[in-house]
């Protein structure tokens, strides 16, 4: 079996955190005899600087040829003034859509060692373990028509479109039920069906799919209520399935329940579990080059990659256990540091995880 992984370090802290993730990947590869081939390229601002495009055609072909893609982060202020169609984020949107990565998995898992890092009371978040499944290739981020125009009265107007087809909803709903079946058998579908036509179709199709999953407890929630409930009582949720924009917002909100977005991995999968894996956090240009970024989200993204694309659960478990051991040792990067723990940099944290494997 081909086991080629395309490594895209990206922008900002991307290259720093990726170096640590690759260190862990190489160690686990050697320990488990997995035989990965690593191929390197650029995405985002780094790709724009090198190729004149945030996603070069040859990079896309490499991504198609690979079994999985591991990404650092994209974006930075130095590209804010270029043509919007060439911004780093457009490369990320394009690679997701071109690879057919329609399902984005964002876990929010609270490590007991970091219970104090959450801004919520420990009793509200203790034992938190939820998964947000976000539809990734449809909805308002891709909908046409979109644009700007000047009205007859001279006023500027901008507009976007939020379309969803039945097939797009059906496949993400099916993925949601499948994930719920692997976990706590509870699925909450989040929409805005009291206002949006797209959400009304969403809810109807989710209900249809539910008939094939009688063992899963399905509930529906409006997105405004879901945002409130995530803060009020987050442990009521097991798997949340929602559209592109709602999922974008709710998954970032859920990430802070855990205390640091620097701890959270994500996976974007196609229909065959080929995927792109990346940390939930951004490129953090304000700390780039300082050696203080938290590499654990990227390292845990490697674990997700091993679990979902390569079906190497033992190797994935080993990485997750190693991260737990490092936290038990009291090692913390600046974003998760608290009194009584030891502050370490990016490289030292990566080395500690390798040593714990």
Curated annotation (Swiss-Prot):
Pfam families: Iso_dh. Keywords: Amino-acid biosynthesis, Branched-chain amino acid biosynthesis, Cytoplasm, Leucine biosynthesis, Magnesium, Manganese, Metal-binding, NAD, Oxidoreductase. It comes from Xanthomonas euvesicatoria pv. vesicatoria (strain 85-10). Its EC number is 1.1.1.85. Catalyzes the oxidation of 3-carboxy-2-hydroxy-4-methylpentanoate (3-isopropylmalate) to 3-carboxy-4-methyl-2-oxopentanoate. The product decarboxylates to 4-methyl-2 oxopentanoate. Homodimer. This is 3-isopropylmalate dehydrogenase. Its main location: cytoplasm. Binds 1 Mg(2+) or Mn(2+) ion per subunit.
């Amino acid at each position: 079996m081909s086991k080629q992984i395309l490594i895209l370090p990206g922008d900002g802290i991307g290259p720093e955190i990726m170096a640590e993730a690759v260190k862990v990947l190489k160690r686990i590869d050697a320990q488990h005899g997995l035989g990965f081939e690593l191929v390197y390229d650029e995405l985002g601002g780094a790709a724009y600087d090198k190729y004149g495009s945030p996603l070069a055609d040859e990079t896309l072909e490499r991504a198609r040829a690979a079994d999985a893609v591991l990404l650092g982060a994209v974006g930075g202020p130095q590209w804010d003034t270029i043509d919007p169609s060439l911004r780093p984020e457009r490369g990320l949107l394009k690679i997701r859509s071109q690879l057919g990565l329609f399902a984005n998995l964002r876990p929010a898992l609270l490590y007991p060692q970091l219970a104090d890092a959450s801004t919520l009371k420990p009793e509200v978040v203790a034992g938190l373990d939820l998964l947000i499944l976000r539809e990734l290739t449809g909805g308002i981020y891709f909908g046409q028509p979109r644009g700007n125009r000047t009205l007859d009265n001279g006023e500027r107007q901008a507009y976007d479109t939020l379309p969803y087809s039945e097939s797009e909803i059906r496949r993400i709903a099916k993925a949601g039920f499948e994930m719920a079946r692997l976990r706590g058998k509870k699925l909450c579908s989040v929409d805005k069906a009291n206002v949006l036509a797209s959400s009304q179709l969403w809810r109807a199709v989710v209900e249809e799919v539910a008939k094939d999953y009688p063992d899963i407890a399905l509930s529906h929630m409006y997105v405004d209520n879901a945002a409130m409930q995530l803060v009020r009582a987050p442990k009521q949720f097991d798997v949340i399935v929602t559209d592109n924009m709602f999922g974008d917002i709710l998954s970032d909100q859920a990430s802070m329940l855990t205390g640091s977005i620097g701890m959270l991995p994500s996976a974007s999968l196609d229909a065959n579990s080929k995927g792109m894996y990346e940390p939930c956090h951004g490129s953090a240009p304000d700390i780039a080059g300082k050696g203080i970024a938290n590499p654990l989200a990227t390292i845990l993204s490697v674990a997700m990659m091993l679990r979902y694309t390569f079906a190497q659960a033992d190797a994935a478990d080993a990485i997750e256990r190693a991260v737990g051991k490092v936290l038990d040792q009291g090692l913390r990067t600046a974003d998760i540091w608290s009194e009584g723990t030891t502050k370490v940099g990016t490289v030292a944290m990566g080395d500690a995880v390798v040593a714990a494997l």
